[in-house]
Amino acid sequence: SDGEPVGYETLNREAASRRAADDGLFFVPFQGYAGQKRFSKASFIGMDLSHDRFHMARAIMEGIVFQVVWMMEAFRSKPSSDGLKLAGGASKSPLWCQITADISGLPVRVPAVADLACVGAAILAGVGTGIYQNAEEGYKHLAIDERVIMPDPERSAEYRRLLPAYKRSVQALGD
């Protein structure tokens, strides 16, 4: 039944079958930006009875990436021409990786190592003991394999069209 728990693979497969920001469904992961009158909690915007938990799962993935891209714009952050690195829980979802590439319009590099925190600790230990001059040298020395997810031009264009609507929705919540 619809209320039964589903596994990660099913969740990703079903969320992938839903359209981008389906009928204006957005998820705002948090709020609290400069100029906002008050802080509010995470919310879904545009949800109606046609949306199911898989629409919501996709909206959560999209909302988090929309927020990251918006923050990059706000800080005028220019990612490397190599693209973005994605690690941790989101990197385990092929759909989330693709959504990240599509919304950002950049290649997404996903390290083959499951737990980069441990790798980071090892690199910093190497820097601390003088094995590496800096963290970048340590990372390059380890030569961690990466898979690269390229943005789909059509979906990227659709997300570029949706980003202003997402921003307006978030700002309206703060009023």
Question: Which residues are covered by each model-predicted region?
Answer:
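Acidic, glycine/GT-rich loop-and beta-edge segments that sit at the periphery of enzyme/chaperone cores
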Residues: S1-V6, G130-D175
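Glycine-rich phosphate-binding/hydrolytic loop that grips phosphoryl groups
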Residues: R58, E62, Q98, A112-H141
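Short, mixed-charge aromatic SLiMs
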Residues: R13-D23, L95, L142-E154
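A short helix-loop
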Residues: S1-Y33, E136-Y139
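A broad structural signal for alpha-helix termini and local helix breaks/kinks
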Residues: S1-D2, P79, S104, T129
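Activation-segment/catalytic-loop signature of the eukaryotic protein kinase fold
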Residues: A16-V113
